[in-house]
Amino acid sequence: MSLLTEVETYVLSIVPSGPLKAEIAQRLEDVFAGKNTDLEALMEWLKTRPILSPLTKGILGFVFTLTVPSERGLQRRRFVQNALNGNGDPNNMDRAVKLYRKLKREITFHGAKEIALSYSAGALASCMGLIYNRMGAVTTEVAFGLVCATCEQIADSQHRSHRQMVATTNPLIRHENRMVLASTTAKAMEQMAGSSEQAAEAMEVASQARQMVQAMRAIGTHPSSSAGLKDDLLENLQTYQKRMGVQMQRFK
């Protein structure tokens, strides 16, 4: 796996699923391929994205700044600086300085990532802030190692939280989660279907599913009534894809 592929993988792991994630993935691919060289416009676009947490925006801004060639005097962005200040905690800053000194002696991506993984996400973000504000200088490879370690820490905590929700025995939470998944699957189907004539059927199925979820929420239904909703939708989607000549088996 190439270095940039690895960076893209880690960064996208902390972005919530949805149309915005697909957009960010495309931007990252363009940046890494050298197709997008307007850092100013890229940062302005990132700043105004909804849903993303300030820290995620800060990490993406850091990655864009590392990758896109820019004029020396280009102004640093406040939204990135604020996100990478370790919540203003002096302990984070102390640890960030110690980590920076270690990273300065490191030259490889994996070496930097190994060192960084033993620090908290707050200290890692502060260390990124030091580098972003030009208070410290490390090689691009080492900076990417720091980025990936930070994303791994964040993704770990997101995964723990997600696992707790999936494993919950509370029927109301499970019911709502199934309806949310069915609704987002329906949205994805509508987007994939596009405007072709054969898409009418898939669009109809997706639309009915969303109306059904709305009705279930409006009248309040038994928690078990949502079982299998998403799977039924995915089966419909796969049937539609086969007719279109697309073979994708990995949605479930």
UniProtKB/Swiss-Prot annotation:
Region (RNP-binding): 165-252
A single MF term (Gene Ontology): RNA binding
Keyword list, A-Z: Host nucleus, Membrane, RNA-binding, Viral matrix protein, Virion
Sequence motif Nuclear localization signal, location on chain: 101-105
Region (Membrane-binding): 1-164
Keyword Cytoplasm in annotation: no
Membrane topology: Peripheral membrane protein
Function of the protein: Plays critical roles in virus replication, from virus entry and uncoating to assembly and budding of the virus particle. M1 binding to ribonucleocapsids (RNPs) in nucleus seems to inhibit viral transcription. Interaction of viral NEP with M1-RNP is thought to promote nuclear export of the complex, which is targeted to the virion assembly site at the apical plasma membrane in polarized epithelial cells. Interactions with NA and HA may bring M1, a non-raft-associated protein, into lipid rafts. Forms a continuous shell on the inner side of the lipid bilayer in virion, where it binds the RNP.
Subunit and partners: Homodimer and homomultimer. Interacts with NEP. Binds ribonucleocapsid by both interacting with genomic RNA and NP protein. May interact with HA and NA. Cannot bind NP without genomic RNA.
Protein name: Matrix protein 1
Native species: Influenza A virus (strain A/Memphis/4/1980 H3N2)
Native organism taxonomy: Viruses, Riboviria, Orthornavirae, Negarnaviricota, Polyploviricotina
Gene: M
